[in-house]
Swiss-Prot record:
Residues 60-63 are annotated as: G3. The keyword rRNA-binding applies. Residues 5-172 form the Era-type G domain. Residues 13-20 are annotated as: G1. Monomer. Residues 39-43 are annotated as: G2. Residues 203-280 form the KH type-2 domain. GTP binds at residues 13-20, 60-64, 122-125. Belongs to the TRAFAC class TrmE-Era-EngA-EngB-Septin-like GTPase superfamily. Era GTPase family. This is GTPase Era. Residues 151-153 are annotated as: G5. It comes from Staphylococcus epidermidis (strain ATCC 35984 / DSM 28319 / BCRC 17069 / CCUG 31568 / BM 3577 / RP62A). Keywords: Cell membrane, Cytoplasm, GTP-binding, Membrane, Nucleotide-binding, Ribosome biogenesis, RNA-binding, rRNA-binding.
Length: 299
């Protein structure tokens, strides 16, 4: 009988290298927020990939960056603390970019870690194959990796091969989650992340990191309909105007796009109510950060 493998794998890397895209690809559902704006992942989002012979729990850590406020401090602590909890580390980089100071900082952080470390070169669909080997040699000059795998999370290229390699390094173990469970976050959290993703896609550079989303109420009204009441928090009146848009058009579009994804997630019709409120300087208010769902694990 084939042994069953299971383990926890941390995905670490600079902002916007494709970590969330990878999680959504291997899980087959939208769990992690995807956006072209940096630093969009705020909580450790655990996606559970279950196969007949293995179960892998992926922890999508916030992108490494220099913190600018209390929320940023929190995001960095989550990323670093994750390294002590896992069976393997995926260090993901954008192969279409030069090695940056952020990459060097992460490799310095990883040098003393005993856990198996895989260098995952993402976005190979954007580069010529001839450029891969020089890039691999560059990274190898910084540190030794357990293995180096080029992939495209967006296109799915080489992803299955990487999963097979990863499985071979994981210990024998049980299924930690039921077959049909794809995340350890409550549905309310995933819903709030979907809404935040749509806002990021539809608003300008000024807005992204000033956005907080809280699901105030989520109730099943009947067998085929869920009512969701949500508050979107911004830091300034001008940002509130941008999110709402002229005549409420922007907010309406956010609701329309979010509802579509939420209905797929829940398998029910959704009535989605969105409110926008100003909470000045909320990213520096620790209690408020906790209130809207960014909570550190307690030992």
């Amino acid at each position: 009988m084939t042994e069953h493998k299971s383990g926890f794998v941390s995905i670490i890397g600079r902002p916007n290298v494709g970590k969330s895209t990878f999680v959504n690809r291997v899980i087959g559902h939208k769990i992690a927020i995807m956006s072209d704006k940096a630093q969009t992942t705020r909580n450790k989002i655990q996606g559970v990939m279950t196969r007949d012979d293995a179960q892998i729990i992926f922890i999508d850590t916030p992108g490494i960056h220099k913190p600018k406020h209390k929320l940023g401090d929190y995001m960095m602590r989550v990323a670093k603390n994750t390294l002590s909890e896992i069976d393997a580390i995926m260090f993901m980089v954008n192969v279409n970019e030069d090695i940056g100071r952020g990459d060097e900082y992460i490799m310095e952080m990883l040098k003393n870690v005993k856990t198996p470390i895989f260098l995952v070169l993402n976005k190979i669909d954007l580069v010529h194959p001839d450029t891969l080997m020089p890039k691999i040699e560059q990274y190898q000059s910084y540190m030794d990796f357990t293995d180096i795998i080029p992939i495209s999370a967006l296109e799915g290229l080489n992803v299955d091969h990487f999963i097979d390699v990863l499985k071979s390094f994981l210990p024998e173990g049980p299924k930690y989650y039921p077959d049909n469970q794809i995340s350890d976050h409550p549905e309310q959290f995933v819903v709030s992340e979907i809404i935040r993703e749509k806002i990021l896609h539809l608003t300008s550079e000024e807005i992204p990191h000033a956005i907080g989303v809280n699901v105030d109420r989520m109730i099943k009204e009947d067998e085929d309909r869920v009512r969701i009441e949500t508050t979107i928090y911004v830091e300034r009146d001008s940002q509130k105007g941008i999110v709402i848009g002229k005549g409420g058009k922007k907010l309406k579009e956010v609701g329309k796009r979010a509802r579509r994804d939420i209905e797929m997630l829940l398998g029910s019709k959704v009535y989605l109510e969105l409110w926008v409120k100003v909470q000045r300087d909320w990213r520096n208010k620790v209690n408020f950060i906790r209130q809207i769902g960014y909570v550190e694990d307690q030992d």
